Amino acid sequence: MTMLIVAIGNPGRQYTWTRHNIGFLCADKLLQGFPEAQFKEARKLFSDIAKVESPQGSMVFIKPRTYVNLSGKAVSAVKEYYGIPIDRILVLADDVNHPFGNVRLRQNAGGGGHKGIKSITQSLGSNDYWQLRLGIGRPQREDIELSDFVLGQFTEEEQIGIQSLFIEASALFSQWCSGTQTA
């Protein structure tokens, strides 16, 4: 059965190395194990899409081109196009409610204030999908707005720590693919 892996982030080079795009970066890292996989634009599905075959089955990775807050439009379109059941959807998203480097895998989880997650839940009419939440922490100073923080570039320290985050995310992703995860 086909699996849908949704990376949340914003399109455009100016956002590539921002905290809000850690989902896009994580998808790129996960796809390194599939050298044949290349993201290609699928305008009618509002996404860049990469398809791979694995021992666990077919996988469709998407990077919505709708910007974070409207991610649900792309997820809903791709889900319908490929006929993917909601419990075979995994969303890779940044999480300000957990310290940088903390990674959690959950099903039926709330959005924690994440507007992209909220958009996906609204578009699908359910939160019965899986989330791989990638901790980015919160601003260290009170004078920094949360929106500026998530759209900000990674610090040098975060750039070093992101590799450990990706290793943990990859392990949880493998568990999810094989069905050995716990909710």
Swiss-Prot record:
Site described as Stabilizes the basic form of H active site to accept a proton, positions?
94
Q: What's this protein's name?
A: Peptidyl-tRNA hydrolase
Compartments (UniProt record): Cytoplasm
Q: Name one GO molecular function term.
A: tRNA binding
Chief place where the protein resides? cytoplasm
Residues recorded as binding tRNA, renumbered to this chain, are 15, 67, 69
* PANTHER family linked: PEPTIDYL-TRNA HYDROLASE
Q: Which Pfam families match?
A: Pept_tRNA_hydro
Which species is the source of this protein?
Chlamydia caviae (strain ATCC VR-813 / DSM 19441 / 03DC25 / GPIC) (Chlamydophila caviae)
Q: Which SUPFAM superfamilies match?
A: Peptidyl-tRNA hydrolase-like
Has the keyword RNA-binding been applied to this entry? yes
Q: What does the record give as the function of this protein?
A: Hydrolyzes ribosome-free peptidyl-tRNAs (with 1 or more amino acids incorporated), which drop off the ribosome during protein synthesis, or as a result of ribosome stalling. Catalyzes the release of premature peptidyl moieties from peptidyl-tRNA molecules trapped in stalled 50S ribosomal subunits, and thus maintains levels of free tRNAs and 50S ribosomes.
EC number(s) for this protein? 3.1.1.29
Task: Describe, as the record does, how this protein assembles with itself and its partners.
Answer: Monomer.
Is tRNA-binding among the key words of this record?
A: yes
Family (UniProt)? Belongs to the PTH family.
Q: Where is this site: Discriminates between blocked and unblocked aminoacyl-tRNA?
A: 10
Residues the record marks as active site: 20
Q: Which UniProt keywords apply?
A: Cytoplasm, Hydrolase, RNA-binding, tRNA-binding
Known catalytic reactions: an N-acyl-L-alpha-aminoacyl-tRNA + H2O = an N-acyl-L-amino acid + a tRNA + H(+)
Q: What's one GO-annotated cellular component?
A: cytoplasm
Q: Which GO terms describe its biological process?
A: protein quality control for misfolded or incompletely synthesized proteins; rescue of stalled ribosome
Which Gene3D superfamilies has this protein been placed in? Peptidyl-tRNA hydrolase (3.40.50.1470)
